[in-house]
Amino acid sequence: MNPLCSELKSGRNAPPAAIGQVLIEALPYIRKFEGKTFVIKYGGSAMKDDKLKNSFAQNVTLLRKVGINVVLVHGGGDAITRTAEKMGLSSRFHHGKRVTDIEMISVVQMTLAGKVNQDIVRLISEHGGKAVGVTGLDADTIKAIPCQNADKLGLVGDVESINTLYIDLLCRAGLIPVIAPIGYDEDGSIYNINADDAASSIAIALKAEKLIYVSDVEGIHVGERILKTICKAEAADFIEQGIISGGMIPKVLSAFKTLDGGVGKIHLIDGKFTHSLLLEIFTHEGVGTQFIAEQDNDNPGKR
């Protein structure tokens, strides 16, 4: 990572001339992405630390102010667990997904659609943005079907369809939709939906320019190095060699599935650093890993 990105990422004050250089570097990207749609999946430490929450809200507001349509999909697993504990309910997981019975789905709905969603909307508004809270239940935003392991997971759903007309309407009005990942089926049953899966489905349905995962992972590591870009062929080789392993494998495979669905690029960035979202989008080098269909040898770091 170049020294300037390191300074800005750390939260330290960078020299004015260096900040000016970043602004100049950002200009072609601002022009390029005006009118485009970015879907951002917001989760991890960036949702817990007050400084990081404010930084993220500032970043999202700026993206919208320069003409980018921002659609935000958030998680909230820790908040759900805390609320459940206060209500005397224990949280159980199966292969990383929350087992969701009738009692737990009420906790999920109350927590995600209530406190978590509205806190994000409030923060964005405090920084000058115009956000609107949305759940998958509103205007059929997310129609769901039972997941394949419903016998073990209960009311956990997969996305069946997305109401793109409603989301587009909000974006055209200059609003930032903040979407809680719950949905319902044709019988009216409500489902808890994995936020990563919901963000991927929304990005594909909207034919988004980018899907950006704000997480607790810096990107894809090869040894001590963070890959700036990775294409499908490289990923297959790294998985075969064991360089990409464990829980990172499904994330990588999901990213390329989303690319195959028509999304322009997928980005994986670390939300534990201030302004990582802007640095990833508006600098040549970026701060995370972008997933692309194939490598462009003429523009290897092009965001």
From Swiss-Prot:
It comes from the Bacteria. InterPro entries: AceGlu_kinase-like_sf (IPR036393), AcgluKinase_fam (IPR004662), ArgB (IPR037528), Asp/Glu/Uridylate_kinase (IPR001048), Glu/AcGlu_kinase (IPR001057), NAGK-C (IPR041727). GO terms for molecular function: acetylglutamate kinase activity; ATP binding. Its EC number is 2.7.2.8. The record marks K41, K251 as: Transition state stabilizer. It catalyses: N-acetyl-L-glutamate + ATP = N-acetyl-L-glutamyl 5-phosphate + ADP. Its main location: cytoplasm. Keywords: Amino-acid biosynthesis, Arginine biosynthesis, ATP-binding, Cytoplasm, Kinase, Nucleotide-binding, Transferase. GO terms for cellular component: cytoplasm. GO terms for biological process: arginine biosynthetic process via ornithine; L-arginine biosynthetic process. Pathway: Amino-acid biosynthesis; L-arginine biosynthesis; N(2)-acetyl-L-ornithine from L-glutamate: step 2/4. It is found in: Cytoplasm. Substrate binds at G76, G77, R98, N192. Belongs to the acetylglutamate kinase family. ArgB subfamily. Catalyzes the ATP-dependent phosphorylation of N-acetyl-L-glutamate. PANTHER family: N-ACETYLGLUTAMATE SYNTHASE (PTHR23342), N-ACETYLGLUTAMATE SYNTHASE, MITOCHONDRIAL (PTHR23342:SF0). This is Acetylglutamate kinase. It comes from Chlorobium phaeobacteroides (strain DSM 266 / SMG 266 / 2430). The lineage of its organism: Bacteria, Pseudomonadati, Chlorobiota, Chlorobiia, Chlorobiales.
